[in-house]
């Protein structure tokens, strides 16, 4: 919830979460009385009278089948009062809101003839040609100026407007679907509705965007309405309105492609939210190579070497080839980022939003138009240079960045040499741009608009007065549209699991956790509603998340559940017989009932690793034995040996390890042999292995620790102290050695090292 309405938090909680009309009435009356606000008294009295009448009927013993429905109607009426009160607080406390309210005070959306105003503008522009030539330009500038002012004021009026009613919704829908109105104006007004709907839910705004999305034949209008409508799915208060949920379901039924677009939009929002991180990556890992290898020109068709007559070119041709290769790799990395949806230009343009044009909030969402009155001075200064035409056709930049570029270029135009001005006239001036041949598709249009929105929510001076719909690390679960209360796991399982797979692939652990925490498995989902493949994927993703969080016992349970499902599916068993535990969300089944020999290798290896990490060496041994028989993989044999050491079968482990050591010169094999020998109490041989590891390039921290054990057991205490100190220098915590000794207590005790010896050694090392 926006911090500007925090004073109303109790009221909203009463209404939305607790559905407590009595408490909500009391709290909002107290709140309004404290602030001296009286113009909601009539609306409050209507709700209170209705509630008192309901109580009176109930006390007399009347049964009313409509009681629950009427109760929720009153809750919604009270919600609109709280909504409007929050707008008042924003106007009282927000710099933009207060200015916008003052500027638009003469506009009442209930009474404003919006369509007529815009149609009048079109007619006035058409009539200019009938005027004398000498006065046409002046008249045109006057009409355009008045129209732009009205558009800006109307934009502000929409943003600060209170809760809408059906009349406003119908009027706005008719305006936004009016084919005679300039599309640029329609797009601007749609952004105003979106901006006014980022915190609290307004059913009539939601319905307006829905009707425009489904009713418009213009893809730009359709997508801008769709983005605003989808963002509203996460706004506070939406759960009060069953009509909104029905509308969402109807939209999916009416448009078979809408579900795909909804999921695609979710991914685009995620990529767009990464713009700052992507910019940091470009600055650190890509731009240095591009700048170092500056003797090349980047064009749309690729990277070309510039002409240079220096003798050094012939002498150092190999170096040039390497530079060319490095530059191509860096350039291609950046282009690949853009193709997958990354906002690669955010960093460059983030410093170019201080021009007067951006002082008006509505201009942040204005479609780029060469004939815009804001570009009149730009065109005059450019003269015959066709930069604006190239900029308009460019498919790389969002509209906001195109305006930034236009204003920035004229500020340095006088410093640009003539030959560079000629290049600016070429169609290839924006050759670095990714040539998106699908620039009129819904995907491209949405991405460009999302970038406009992202720049506003990240860079605008008044951004703190709005609740950004973009994802922040600490608020992942609040910004994911698929986590809306309107989304059910049963209905959206493919999309939810696809996003979860995406999260795992890109190691977005917070997002994966948010998804799996929100969409919990139930008895009905496991035994009936979800298909086998969806269930198995859920458990696989759950296991991966738990492994990442070092919750190895729970990961074992997740992978075991997957294996049980695999067996059940293969044998055609009735899923209703599964013993699902709703508290843990796992399927309870004894390990002995699982047929490991028939299990898929990819699943069994995950289960085996979880068992090994959890310390269940007996289970890990069994799994790796079967995996080694299925696949003669090096890693399976190595982990099998580790598990055997864990169960005390060191000789069998060494047999495997010595064979691996002959086949592969691998440090991890030698490290495991050293550990096995230490466990076996063959301390001298173990010491020799650790001594070699410490002198190698493949040393790891625990080599020092285990070498220290060998030295200590062999009574080489001064060398042991050095090894432990080296290990401590890497661990950098005073308790590390104590924890290590406790963990390896059995090995040390078996070698005759007592608890007192351990305490003394810790003190010596820490001196």
Where are these regions (language model features)?
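"A position-specific structural signal for the A-helix of alpha-solenoid helical repeats
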Residues: 10, 30, 46-49, 188-192, ...
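TPR/TPR-like (Sel1-like) alpha-helical repeat modules
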Residues: 33, 230-254, 559-567, 709-735, ...
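Boundary/linker segments of alpha-helical solenoid repeat arrays
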Residues: 37-41, 217-226, 238-241, 252-265, ...
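Alpha-solenoid helical-repeat scaffolds
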Residues: 365-577, 588-596, 606
């Amino acid at each position: 919830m926006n911090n500007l309405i925090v004073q109303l938090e109790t009221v909203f909680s009463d209404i939305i979460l607790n559905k407590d009309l009595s408490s909500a009435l009391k709290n909002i009356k107290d709140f309004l009385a404290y602030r001296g606000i009286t113009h909601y008294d009539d609306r409050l009295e209507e709700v209170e009278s209705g509630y008192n009448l309901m109580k009176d009927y109930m006390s007399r013993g009347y049964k009313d089948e409509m009681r629950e429905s009427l109760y929720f109607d009153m809750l919604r009426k009270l919600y609109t009062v709280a909504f409007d009160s929050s707008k008042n607080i924003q106007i009282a406390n927000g710099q933009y809101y207060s200015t916008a309210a003052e500027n638009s005070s003469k506009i009442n959306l209930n009474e404003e003839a919006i369509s007529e105003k815009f149609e009048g503008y079109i007619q006035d522009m058409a009539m200019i040609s009938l005027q004398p030539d000498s006065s046409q330009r002046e008249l045109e500038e006057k009409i355009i100026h008045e129209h732009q002012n009205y558009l800006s004021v109307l934009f502000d009026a929409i943003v600060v407007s209170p809760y809408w009613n059906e009349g406003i919704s119908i009027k706005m829908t008719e305006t936004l679907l009016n084919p005679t109105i300039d599309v640029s104006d329609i797009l601007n007004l749609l952004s105003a509705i979106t901006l006014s709907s980022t915190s609290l839910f307004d059913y009539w705004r939601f319905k307006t965007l829905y009707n425009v999305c489904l009713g418009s034949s213009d893809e730009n209008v359709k997508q801008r309405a769709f983005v605003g409508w989808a963002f509203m799915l996460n706004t506070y208060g939406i759960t009060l309105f069953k009509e909104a949920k029905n509308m969402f379901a109807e939209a999916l039924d009416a448009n078979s492609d809408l579900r795909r677009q909804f999921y695609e939009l979710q991914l685009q929002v995620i990529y767009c939210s990464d713009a700052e991180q992507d910019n940091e990556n470009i600055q650190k890992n890509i731009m240095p190579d591009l700048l170092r290898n500056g003797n090349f020109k980047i064009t749309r068709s690729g990277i070309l070497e510039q002409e240079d007559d220096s003798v050094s070119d012939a002498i150092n041709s190999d170096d040039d080839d390497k530079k060319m290769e490095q530059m191509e790799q860096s350039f291609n990395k950046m282009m690949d980022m853009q193709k997958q949806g990354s906002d690669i230009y955010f960093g460059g343009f983030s410093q170019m939003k201080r021009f007067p044009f951006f002082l008006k909030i509505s201009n942040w969402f204005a479609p780029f138009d060469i004939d815009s009155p804001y570009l009149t001075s730009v065109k005059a200064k450019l003269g015959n240079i066709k930069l604006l035409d190239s900029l308009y056709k460019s498919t790389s930049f969002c509209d906001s960045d195109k305006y930034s570029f236009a204003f920035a270029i004229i500020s340095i135009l006088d410093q640009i040499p003539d030959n560079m001005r000629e290049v600016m006239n070429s169609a290839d001036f924006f050759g670095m741009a990714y040539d998106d041949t699908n620039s009129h598709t819904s995907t491209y249009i949405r991405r460009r608009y999302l970038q406009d929105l992202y720049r506003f929510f990240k860079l605008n001076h008044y951004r703190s007065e709005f609740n950004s719909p973009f994802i922040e690390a600490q608020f992942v679960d609040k910004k994911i549209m698929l986590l809306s209360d309107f989304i059910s796991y049963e209905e959206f399982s493919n999309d939810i699991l696809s996003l979860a797979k995406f999260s795992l692939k890109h190691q977005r652990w917070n997002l994966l956790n948010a998804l799996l925490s929100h969409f919990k498995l139930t008895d009905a989902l496991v035994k009936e509603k979800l298909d086998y493949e969806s269930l198995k994927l859920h458990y696989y993703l759950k296991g991966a998340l738990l492994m990442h969080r070092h919750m190895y016992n729970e990961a074992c349970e997740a992978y075991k559940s997957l294996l049980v499902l695999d067996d059940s599916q293969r044998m055609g068993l009735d899923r209703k017989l599964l013993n699902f535990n709703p508290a843990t969300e796992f399927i309870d089944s004894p390990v002995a009932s699982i047929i490991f020999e028939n299990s898929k290798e990819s699943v069994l290896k995950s289960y085996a690793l979880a068992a090994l990490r959890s310390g269940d060496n007996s289970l890990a041994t069994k799994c790796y034995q079967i995996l080694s028989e299925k696949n003669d993989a090096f890693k399976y044999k190595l982990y099998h040996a580790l598990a055997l050491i864990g169960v005390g079968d060191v000789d069998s482990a060494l047999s495997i390890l010595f064979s691996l050591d002959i086949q592969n010169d691998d440090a991890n094999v030698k490290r495991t042999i050293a550990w096995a020998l230490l466990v076996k109490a063959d301390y001298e041989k173990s010491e020799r292995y650790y001594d070699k590891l410490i002198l190698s390039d493949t040393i790891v921290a625990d080599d020092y620790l285990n070498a220290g054990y060998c030295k200590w057991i062999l009574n080489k205490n001064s060398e042991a102290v050095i090894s432990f100190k080296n290990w401590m220098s890497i661990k950098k915590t005073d308790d590390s050695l104590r924890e290590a000794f406790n963990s390896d207590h059995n090995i040390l005790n078996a070698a005759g090292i007592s608890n007192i010896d351990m305490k003394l050694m810790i003190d010596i090392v820490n001196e």
